Regions:
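A generic structural signal for alpha->beta connector loops
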Residues: 61, 84, 129, 168-170, ...
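Glycine-rich phosphate-binding "P-loop"
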Residues: 33-43, 177-185
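Conserved acidic, metal-coordinating active-site core of Asp-based
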Residues: 133-209, 213-222, 226, 231
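Non-catalytic pre-domain segments flanking phosphatase-related domains
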Residues: 1-29, 33-37, 41, 48, ...
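Hydrophobic "anchor" residues on beta-strands that sit immediately upstream
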Residues: 24-26, 86, 207
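Active-site phosphate-binding/coordination module
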Residues: 44-135
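Conserved Rossmann-like nucleotide-cofactor binding loop
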Residues: 32, 72, 214
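Mg2+-dependent phosphoryl-transfer enzymes with acidic/Ser/Thr/Gly-rich catalytic loops
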Residues: 1-7, 20, 190-265
C-alpha cells in the first residue's frame, strides 16, 4: 500500500471507520475486484474476495455497493455472493437495490435515437476484431487482446462516425482500460457517490475502490475524510489517496475494514 496524498493517514481513517455510526463501502468490479479478461463473461473475482464481501454483508456494519460500468444484468451472475448487494450499473444510469428493486434514469429520446444510429457501427468494429457491448445509456467498444493496428482501426472508425454526428450529439466519449465508450451525457460514477453520501448522512465513513479513468469521477466526488483507493497492478496518475495492488493488498484492505468496522458493534 502506498499513500499518495500526504494529508491522508490510513491508520486515522480506519480509526474513524471503527468509531463511525455508519459506513459505506463502494467498489468497482472490473480491474478492482476481478482481473480483466478478454471475455468479460469470464472476468471472475480474485480468490478470497467474495468470501470477504459475504462476511462484511453478514456483519451488517457496512452498506456495501458495487459501482460498475457494466449493465447490471451482466454483472450479477459474476458476483456469486450469498446476497446480492446494491449495484449501480452503466456508470450510474441504473440502480439495482438489494431487494431487487430496479430503476433506470430517464434517457432523452434524442440520445436514444443516436444510440440506435451508433448500433449500425457494430458490424464494422467487429470486422476489425473488436467487441461491442450495449448497455442502458451507452455503447462500449472493446479491444482487449487485439494488436495495435486493430486498436487504431477501431478507434479511428468510431471517432470518425462520432464526429459525423456533430457536436452536441448528447453522446460523450470516454476512454477506459481496454476500449472506448460512447455514453449519454449527464451521469457518471461521481453522481453515484454524491447520491450515496447524501443518503448516508453526516457521520458516515465512506471509501471508494476503483482502478480505471472512469473511477476518477468518483474519487473527486468523495467528501473530506473519505478514502479514495486506486486498485491496480501498475500505478497511474490519480486523485486517489491510496494505491493498493491486487490481490494481496486488496484482500488486506477489505480484511482491515471488516475488522475495524466490526469492533464497535
Amino acid at each position: 500500500m502506498r499513500t499518495l496524498d500526504p494529508s491522508f493517514d490510513p491508520d486515522a481513517f480506519f480509526a474513524r471507520a471503527r468509531a463511525a455510526t455508519s459506513r459505506v463501502l463502494m467498489l468497482d468490479y472490473d480491474g478492482t475486484l476481478a482481473p480483466f479478461h478478454v471475455n468479460p463473461a469470464e472476468a471472475v473475482p480474485y480468490d478470497g474476495v467474495m468470501p470477504l464481501l459475504d462476511e462484511i454483508q453478514d456483519a451488517g456494519h457496512t452498506r456495501l455497493v458495487i459501482v460498475s460500468g457494466r449493465w447490471t444484468k451482466n454483472l450479477v451472475p459474476l458476483l456469486k455472493l450469498k446476497r446480492t448487494p446494491e449495484i449501480w450499473g452503466s456508470h450510474g444510469w441504473e440502480r439495482l437495490g438489494p431487494q431487487g428493486e430496479y430503476n433506470v434514469a430517464r434517457i432523452s429520446d434524442v440520445t436514444l435515437e443516436i444510440l440506435v444510429t451508433a448500433d449500425e457501427w457494430i458490424k464494422q468494429v467487429e470486422r476489425f476484431g473488436g467487441r461491442c457491448e450495449r448497455k442502458p445509456g451507452g455503447l462500449a467498444f472493446h479491444w482487449r487482446g487485439l494488436n495495435n493496428a486493430q486498436i487504431a482501426e477501431i478507434r479511428s472508425e468510431v471517432f470518425e462516425r462520432w464526429i459525423e454526428l456533430g457536436r452536441g450529439n448528447d453522446l460523450s466519449w470516454y476512454d477506459f482500460d481496454g476500449g472506448i465508450e460512447l455514453r449519454a451525457a449527464g451521469r457518471d460514477k461521481g453522481d453515484v457517490v454524491r447520491t450515496l453520501v447524501g443518503e448516508a448522512g453526516s457521520g458516515a465513513i465512506v471509501a471508494y475502490l476503483g482502478d480505471d479513468l472512469t473511477d476518477e469521477h468518483a474519487f473527486k466526488a468523495l467528501p473530506p475524510g473519505s478514502a479514495a483507493v486506486l486498485v491496480r497492478p501498475q500505478f497511474r496518475p490519480t486523485a486517489a489517496h491510496l494505491w493498493i495492488q491486487p490481490p494481496a493488498e486488496l484482500l488486506s484492505f477489505l480484511t482491515r475494514w471488516n475488522e475495524m468496522a466490526g469492533c464497535n458493534r
